Design a protein with these regions (language model features):
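Arg/Lys-rich amphipathic alpha helix in sigma70-family domain 2
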Residues: 45, 55-77
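Amphipathic, Lys/Arg- and hydrophobic-enriched alpha-helical face
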Residues: 3-24, 37-41, 99, 103, ...
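Amphipathic helix-loop-helix modules that constitute alpha-helical solenoid scaffolds
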Residues: 73-129, 133-287
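Structural recognition of an alpha-helix C-terminal capping motif at a helix-to-coil junction
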Residues: 29-36, 40, 48-60, 140
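A short, charge-rich alpha-helical start-of-domain segment used by transcription regulators
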Residues: 1-15, 25-28, 153-165
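Structural motif corresponding to the intra-repeat A-B loop/turn of tetratricopeptide repeats
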Residues: 212, 275-278, 311, 342, ...
Length: 381
């Protein structure tokens, strides 16, 4: 029994049932029942068309459940007994499921959980462990998400940008518990790229690959963070970086620039530099200008201030930083870095300590605390 085949077919089969009129929760139950039957039947009698077999089995189980449950009987009027002629391509069914899981009515956290459950095929326990919450809490979150999208009919294409933002949230969780969420996000984005031809899908995939390429060098053996400038670039995954750059170049050639392509271009410039000193910061500032134009995001402008500090000197970076809200996350850490670059070590040490107090996670807090301690050691008479 090829479990990877079943996992790869599940989103498309689920998408078929939703397209035919099944609500999400009922469709998922039917597909799970069909998968159980496949595990039992296929070893002795493998089907010629695995997806067709699963669709037929799941559809029958859905109809049986609909007929047998009086509370669901009212839905029969809008469910055809036979599948409509001319089924949509598998890619369309998978894509519809992505749109459903990233529906605007869902909170970002619920969209992420539902995407991992329905499209990624992860168990509720795996998702709960990845997000460090009790399994019961995650089960409730997923159940609420299913109820929210039940009955939603996606007769028109959904918003690709919403799906991409959901996948990027998954990617940014990195690795937690027994699930490599970054690798899972890359897998799902690859799957999405085969279903929809959009340069921003390619841009996101390129961005993920370029960031993932640096993963092995991001932490020291003791688990502490290693800043980009100090990373051992020989530990970067050159194959993943090259793939990301190739995907990005093809996307940029279509001349439909979007925010993920711009972010990937910045990551590509870092990947191109053999050493931190060879980084083309002038081009990076130009790409941040494009990204700021596309998003008008204060976080982008914060990162731009860092790049300006590298391209034009720390005082120019501090001038760019002065125009931003000091309450921005990581504003104080950026200010500390720029003050250190400018030679103002007492101010930098104080700001590193302050930034550590407000750090969003333990790894960053420890890193900023070490930076403050390092400078304070130099300042002692």
């Amino acid at each position: 029994m090829d479990e990877s085949l079943l996992r790869s077919l599940t989103p498309s089969v689920l998408g078929v049932l939703v397209r035919r009129g099944a609500d999400f929760a009922a469709a998922e139950d039917a597909v799970q029942d069909a998968l159980v039957e496949a595990v039992r039947v296929w070893p002795a009698d493998p089907p010629r068309d695995p997806k067709g077999w699963l669709v037929t089995a799941a559809w029958r189980k859905f109809l049986d459940a609909t007929r047998s449950d009086a509370a669901r009987r009212r839905r029969e009027d809008r469910v055809d007994e036979e599948p409509p002629p001319g089924p949509a391509p598998a890619a369309d069914d998978t894509l519809q499921l992505y749109f459903l899981c990233a529906h605007p009515s869902l909170t970002p956290a619920s969209a992420v959980a539902l995407t991992l459950r329905a499209v990624g095929g992860l168990t509720t326990r795996q998702i709960a462990r990845a997000y460090l919450v009790p399994e019961a809490t995650m089960a409730q979150r997923i159940s609420r998400a299913k109820r929210t999208v039940s009955g939603v009919r996606l007769d028109r294409p959904g918003d690709v940008a919403t799906v991409l933002r959901t996948l990027y949230l998954v990617f940014n969780e990195g690795y937690s518990g027994d699930v490599d969420l970054a690798a899972e996000a890359i897998r799902l984005t690859r799957q999405l790229s085969s279903a929809v031809d959009h340069p921003e899908v390619a841009g996101l995939l390129a961005l993920m690959l370029l960031h993932h390429a640096r993963r092995a060098a991001r932490t020291a053996p003791d688990g502490s963070l290693v800043p980009l400038a100090e990373q051992d670039r020989h530990r970067w995954d050159t194959r993943a970086a090259a793939e990301g750059i190739g995907i990005l170049q093809a996307a940029l050639a279509r001349d439909r620039l979007g925010e993920f392509q711009a972010q990937a271009a910045i990551a590509a410039l870092h990947a191109d530099a053999l050493t931190a000193e060879e980084t083309d910061w002038v081009q990076i500032v130009e790409w941040y200008d494009e990204l700021a134009r596309l998003t008008d995001s204060p976080v982008v402008r914060l990162n731009r201030a860092v790049a300006v500090g590298e391209a034009d000197g720390p005082h120019a970076g501090l001038a760019a930083l002065a125009a931003l809200d000091p309450a921005l996350p990581r504003h104080t850490a950026v200010a500390a870095h720029l003050h250190e670059r400018a030679g103002d070590l007492p101010t930098a040490a104080r700001l590193y300590a302050e930034a550590a107090h407000h750090a969003p996670n333990l790894a960053e807090r420890n890193h900023l605390t070490r930076q403050a301690a390092r400078l304070n050691t130099h300042l002692r008479p």
